[in-house]
Amino acid sequence: VYGLKPSYGIVPLEGHYFPGTDGADIPLSVTGPLARTAEDLALAINLTSDIALQGAPSRSLKDYRLLVITETDLAIVDDEIAQAVESIAAQCENAGATVSRSSDLLPELAGLHSQYLHMLLTVLAVRDPTSDYPLPDLPGWCDMLDQQARARRQYRALFEQFDAILCPNAGTTAFPHTPVPMNDRKLVVNGEEQEFGKQFGWVSIATYPGLPAVSAPIGADSEGLPIGLQIITDFHADHTAVELGRLIGALGNG
């Protein structure tokens, strides 16, 4: 199954608003399609987007410049997932793509993640009468929006040198459902227990600056659970992410 988290604001959120609201877009929130193929993702985003998106720049892997991230200080990644992403990177490189594993243009992810969490918790607290999270005043909220805009501009500079970021969707494959509250949940990754919330480190890379991200299947772990690749592109370059998902899917790993 393929999925697209579209660029922020391009797909209407009607039917997805918080109860009691009258239609204001929800910061950080998007809605996007799921599909069996990347081709169907492309069709779905064209049908649902409020703007006319540009097509992908190329239909050949040899024309793409890729930045690969398989580890950060924010979240531990299962070795099988990291190996699967590295295998895809190697196959892309063999197909002629330019592959890098570091760049001075990559924003400082830990700092942006902290800003993301502050914005996320603020948005959640606004409509939660039981929340004790401290809400910002108006100048404070404007500062948060300025920080987010700066993050998007930082990524815009990165995407002048790269067409996409390849990284894990999450640090683990699917785990058992549990009624344990999110703040108390734990995950075991490579034998090491960590807080569930730290996995949001992979979510925030695309979500905080409002960038599009495709989730593409790239195989399975030793227990047969699917491994997903996250393909992140520049703002409004949704079709580039989708096309890369198609090209990577054609390598035969999904």
Residue ranges of model-derived segments:
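Amidase signature
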Residues: 43-198, 208, 236, 247-253
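Structural helix-boundary/capping segments
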Residues: 1-72, 86-95, 207-254
